[in-house]
């Protein structure tokens, strides 16, 4: 756990392009559309009828906003972990007790694909590695909160 200084810099610099003018909402929608299209059975966990459900865009926007929070705390790993763990704990309270740890790996793949789609060539091999490491830290903290 923990990103190197170089990885933190890459994540922070690419986040500006990933977030874009919509704070990442488009990336979030694309991420969850891909994820739920590939994993139809998981849509019901979120109360969606499928990947085209209108709530998918809203969920994607919320998730990307939380990623933005995590990115803002990359220099303070303890704070980032605490923030993301708290998000996981809150989700238990929302009734999302059926979210499983194994959902996060394919979701991460969909997220990285959507990010790359948005920023194109700026998603270099180093950026992919940095974002994969950041996502591992973020999702690990979320899972910890969900399972607490």
Curated annotation (Swiss-Prot):
Give the matching Gene3D superfamilies.
Globins
An example Pfam family from this entry, by short name, is Globin
Record bears the keyword Membrane: no
Could you tell me which PROSITE patterns the record lists for this protein? Answer: GLOBIN
Q: Does the keyword Metal-binding apply?
A: yes
The subunit field of the Swiss-Prot or TrEMBL record says: Monomer.
Q: What is this protein called?
A: Globin, monomeric component M-IV
């Amino acid at each position: 756990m923990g990103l190197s200084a170089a990885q933190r810099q890459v994540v922070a610099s690419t986040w500006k392009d990933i977030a874009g003018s919509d704070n990442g909402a488009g990336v979030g929608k694309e991420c969850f559309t891909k994820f739920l299209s590939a994993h139809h059975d998981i849509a019901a966990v979120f109360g969606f009828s499928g990947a085209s459900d209108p709530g998918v865009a809203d969920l994607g926007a919320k998730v990307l906003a939380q990623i933005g929070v995590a990115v803002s705390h990359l220099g303070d790993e303890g704070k980032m972990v605490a923030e993301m763990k708290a998000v996981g704990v809150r989700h238990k309270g929302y009734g999302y007790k059926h979210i499983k740890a194994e959902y996060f790996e394919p979701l991460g793949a969909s997220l990285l694909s959507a990010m790359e789609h948005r920023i194109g060539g700026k998603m270099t091999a180093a950026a992919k590695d940095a974002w994969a490491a950041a996502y591992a830290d973020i999702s690990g903290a979320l899972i910890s909160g969900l399972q607490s």
